[in-house]
A protein has these predicted regions:
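Beta-strand scaffold of nucleotide-dependent catalytic cores
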Residues: 25-28, 52-53
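C-terminal helix-rich "cap/oligomerization" subdomain common to oxidoreductases
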Residues: 107-161
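Alpha-helix N-cap/loop-to-helix initiation residues
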Residues: 32-33, 101, 139
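A broad, low-specificity signal marking well-ordered, structured residues that form hydrophobic/aromatic
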Residues: 24, 41, 157
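Glycine-rich phosphate/pyrophosphate-binding beta-alpha loops
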Residues: 27-36, 93-97
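C-terminal glycine/acidic-rich active-site capping loop/insertion
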Residues: 1-20, 41-42, 47-131
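Glycine-rich Rossmann NAD(P)(H)-binding loop
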Residues: 27-31, 44-47, 160-161
């Protein structure tokens, strides 16, 4: 569905098939009345799922089959190294999208600093936790494949990257 003056859809539903056989659904909308940029991410598998809501950014829900939902909060000692490095506020203090982008810029700058200082970084160093050129190219290829599928009567379209 195209909004006035738009070149791409304001509202999309995409069926996905991943390598290994997993299937998914992506729903993205800029026209859901009352949502106010309410980004939600839910991923479900055979044994459980995870859920995150932009309006509650410090909380991640983990849902296992036949177990109670587990709630993880930012800035707590049980988080992994990269999650801890990305946390800028103490527990119970909300972080927002500005901090998320600041983390990307900080990690990129720290990576460049390490290169300039000829320091080797381990594969799991937080300084390497930022989107790479390949991620951007893959994202653009995904959008092109979705548009191609839409123009081709919504037929399955291979993502070539």
């Amino acid at each position: 569905q195209l909004g006035k003056g738009r070149k791409l859809d304001d509202d999309v539903n995409v069926l996905l098939r991943f390598e290994g056989g997993a299937k998914g659904i992506l729903h993205a909308s800029q026209i859901s009345v009352g949502e106010e940029n309410n980004l939600n991410i839910r991923v479900y598998g055979e044994n459980g799922g995870i859920e995150w809501h932009q309006k509650e950014p410090n909380t991640m829900l983990v849902k296992w089959l036949d177990q109670p939902t587990q709630l993880y909060r930012a800035a707590n000692g049980y988080l992994g190294k990269n999650a801890a490095a990305a946390t800028r506020t103490p527990p119970a203090h909300p972080e927002g999208s500005l901090e998320a982008f600041a983390n990307i810029y900080k990690n990129f700058a720290n990576h460049i600093r390490a290169i300039n200082e000829k320091r080797k970084l381990s594969k799991d160093d937080p300084a390497l936790d930022y989107p790479k050129i390949e991620d951007g190219v893959r994202g653009m290829a995904f959008i092109e494949a979705v548009v191609k599928s839409s123009k081709g009567n919504a037929k399955w379209t291979k993502l070539d990257v």
